[in-house]
Amino acid sequence: IERYGSRLTGLPEGAEFPLLLKLLAARGSLSVQVHPDDEYAKVHENKLGKTEAWVILHAEEGASLLYGIREGVTIDDLRRALTGGEDVEPLIQRVPVKAGDVFYMPAGMVHAIGGGILLYEIQQSSDVTYRLWDFNRVNARGEKRPLHIQQSLDVIRPELKGLRAHMPEHPAQEITHLLDVPAFTLDCVAADGACILPAAETFRVLTALEPLTLRWLEGEMELK
């Protein structure tokens, strides 16, 4: 990206690369968190906000996520629980997962990865995360991780339900559109042989779940 800049990304010269992509393996439950939108993050953090999506690559039996606030729970309910140091997990929807499930979390939606899950994460290029609950865990010195109660209450939107999709097990077409949201689109490409990707106005990021060869006019590259 530093070398080729806008010729590679299709973005205006000097523009920050807008996405982060990660592989996350969770042995145990991660902290419950929420991210601000661009407007709040700009004012309070001088940074971008964050929306993100998860593609479940592997899930142990019984694995689950925390994904959005339960129906009927209000921001006042959350405020009482958070300021009172109560366990907020009963206020959050727990969703079972399996390999191939896709979850989108817009800014303001509470979420947490459960244990026994390997996932692929696509997100806006931002490190702004507000931790609202960490299950009262302590480190070796008996210290709890810091929480961001007021910031979380500022940005949580209990009405958000996110978007869900599933990677096709037996795709009837080469390209399956999974998500199309303001920050990114997410497609699943499955081909028995060669697949020609249509032209795009900006960059693509290809992540190979199985070995493949990427070919273009000037050469080719093995993805493993």
Model-derived segments and spans:
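Glycine-rich, small/acidic residue-mixed loop/short-helix segments
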Residues: 221
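Short secondary-structure transition/capping segments
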Residues: 106-108, 150-151
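Active-site region of the double-stranded beta-helix
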Residues: 1-99, 113-209, 217-218
